[in-house]
UniProtKB/Swiss-Prot annotation:
<feature type="site" description="Reactive bond 3">
    <location>
        <begin position="16"/>
        <end position="17"/>
    </location>
</feature>
<keyword id="KW-0722">Serine protease inhibitor</keyword>
<dbReference type="GO" id="GO:0005576">
    <property type="term" value="C:extracellular region"/>
</dbReference>
<keyword id="KW-0325">Glycoprotein</keyword>
<keyword id="KW-0646">Protease inhibitor</keyword>
<dbReference type="InterPro" id="IPR036058">
    <property type="entry name" value="Kazal_dom_sf"/>
</dbReference>
<protein>
    <recommendedName>
        <fullName>Ovomucoid</fullName>
    </recommendedName>
</protein>
<feature type="glycosylation site" description="N-linked (GlcNAc...) asparagine">
    <location>
        <position position="43"/>
    </location>
</feature>
<feature type="disulfide bond">
    <location>
        <begin position="14"/>
        <end position="33"/>
    </location>
</feature>
<keyword id="KW-0964">Secreted</keyword>
<feature type="disulfide bond">
    <location>
        <begin position="6"/>
        <end position="36"/>
    </location>
</feature>
<dbReference type="InterPro" id="IPR051597">
    <property type="entry name" value="Bifunctional_prot_inhibitor"/>
</dbReference>
<dbReference type="GO" id="GO:0004867">
    <property type="term" value="F:serine-type endopeptidase inhibitor activity"/>
</dbReference>
<feature type="domain" description="Kazal-like">
    <location>
        <begin position="4"/>
        <end position="54"/>
    </location>
</feature>
<keyword id="KW-1015">Disulfide bond</keyword>
<dbReference type="Pfam" id="PF00050">
    <property type="entry name" value="Kazal_1"/>
</dbReference>
<feature type="disulfide bond">
    <location>
        <begin position="22"/>
        <end position="54"/>
    </location>
</feature>
Length: 54
Protein backbone atom coordinates (compact mmCIF):
# COMPACT_ATOMS: atom_id res chain seq x y z
CA UNK A 1 0.00 0.00 0.00
CA UNK A 2 1.35 3.41 -0.93
CA UNK A 3 1.77 5.84 1.92
CA UNK A 4 3.02 9.36 2.52
CA UNK A 5 4.45 10.71 5.76
CA UNK A 6 2.46 13.82 6.62
CA UNK A 7 3.82 14.20 10.16
CA UNK A 8 5.51 17.55 9.42
CA UNK A 9 2.35 19.14 8.01
CA UNK A 10 0.33 21.30 7.64
CA UNK A 11 2.53 23.90 6.00
CA UNK A 12 1.37 27.46 5.28
CA UNK A 13 2.85 27.51 1.77
CA UNK A 14 3.34 24.71 -0.74
CA UNK A 15 5.86 24.71 -3.56
CA UNK A 16 4.70 24.64 -7.16
CA UNK A 17 6.45 21.37 -7.97
CA UNK A 18 4.22 18.97 -9.86
CA UNK A 19 4.37 15.41 -8.55
CA UNK A 20 0.73 14.34 -8.57
CA UNK A 21 -0.85 12.05 -6.00
CA UNK A 22 -4.34 10.58 -6.06
CA UNK A 23 -6.33 10.83 -2.85
CA UNK A 24 -8.99 8.46 -1.54
CA UNK A 25 -11.50 11.20 -2.46
CA UNK A 26 -10.62 10.63 -6.15
CA UNK A 27 -9.04 14.08 -6.35
CA UNK A 28 -5.61 14.61 -7.88
CA UNK A 29 -3.31 16.67 -5.65
CA UNK A 30 -0.47 18.47 -7.40
CA UNK A 31 2.17 17.49 -4.83
CA UNK A 32 2.78 15.96 -1.41
CA UNK A 33 2.43 19.29 0.38
CA UNK A 34 -1.03 20.00 -1.04
CA UNK A 35 -2.07 16.42 -0.34
CA UNK A 36 -0.78 16.45 3.25
CA UNK A 37 -2.47 19.76 4.00
CA UNK A 38 -5.72 18.19 2.80
CA UNK A 39 -5.07 15.11 4.97
CA UNK A 40 -4.67 17.35 8.02
CA UNK A 41 -7.83 19.29 7.10
CA UNK A 42 -9.75 16.01 6.83
CA UNK A 43 -8.67 14.94 10.34
CA UNK A 44 -6.95 11.91 8.82
CA UNK A 45 -9.92 10.57 6.86
CA UNK A 46 -8.22 11.30 3.53
CA UNK A 47 -5.67 8.70 2.50
CA UNK A 48 -3.42 8.11 -0.50
CA UNK A 49 -4.99 6.02 -3.23
CA UNK A 50 -1.89 5.90 -5.44
CA UNK A 51 0.92 8.01 -6.84
CA UNK A 52 0.16 9.81 -10.08
CA UNK A 53 -3.04 11.36 -11.38
CA UNK A 54 -6.40 9.84 -10.47
Amino acid sequence: IASVDCSDYPKPVCSLEYMPLCGSDSKTYSNKCNFCNAVVDSNGTLTLSHFGKC
